[in-house]
Amino acid sequence: MPTINQLVRKPRKSRSSLNKAPALQHNPQKRAVCVKVYTTTPKKPNSALRKVARVKIAGYGSEVIAYIPGEGHNLQEHSVILIRGGRVKDLPGVRYHIIRGALDSRGVQNRKKARSKYGVKKS
């Protein structure tokens, strides 16, 4: 533990909080272009084929992996999409979500509940 004299000479530094979605550069969403659309498997207790896309963020150039939520999608290489922050707990390295129903990403078909999260208009 430091003495009072040591604290007077060099005060304590406050820790800066860690940014969980640095590629968004403090923006709520960013436009991006799909580089590769593929499936991957989750961590140990879970088993599935999760749909993800490697995307290049417009005007920034960094490539990140983004999750494609919902059942079925129409994304392919060169699709222009909108991404938001939000990790997927069982997929390491996936820290972004693709927003369904925005730009080239179509909303989920036949979705009745939680429609706003999947870009579906009221039928």
From Swiss-Prot:
Keywords: Methylation, Ribonucleoprotein, Ribosomal protein, RNA-binding, rRNA-binding, tRNA-binding
This protein's encoding gene: rpsL
SUPFAM superfamilies on file: Nucleic acid-binding proteins
GO biological-process terms attached to the record: translation
Region Disordered, annotated ranges: 1-26
Protein name: Small ribosomal subunit protein uS12
Function: With S4 and S5 plays an important role in translational accuracy. Interacts with and stabilizes bases of the 16S rRNA that are involved in tRNA selection in the A site and with the mRNA backbone. Located at the interface of the 30S and 50S subunits, it traverses the body of the 30S subunit contacting proteins on the other side and probably holding the rRNA structure together. The combined cluster of proteins S8, S12 and S17 appears to hold together the shoulder and platform of the 30S subunit.
Database matches in CDD domains: Ribosomal_S12
Cited InterPro entries: NA-bd_OB-fold (IPR012340), Ribosomal_uS12 (IPR006032), Ribosomal_uS12_bac (IPR005679)
Residue positions where 3-methylthioaspartic acid is found in the record: D90
GO molecular function: rRNA binding; structural constituent of ribosome; tRNA binding
Record PANTHER family: 30S RIBOSOMAL PROTEIN S12 FAMILY MEMBER (PTHR11652)
Family classification: Belongs to the universal ribosomal protein uS12 family.
Source taxon at top rank: Bacteria
Quaternary structure, from the entry: Part of the 30S ribosomal subunit. Contacts proteins S8 and S17. May interact with IF1 in the 30S initiation complex.
One GO CC annotation: small ribosomal subunit
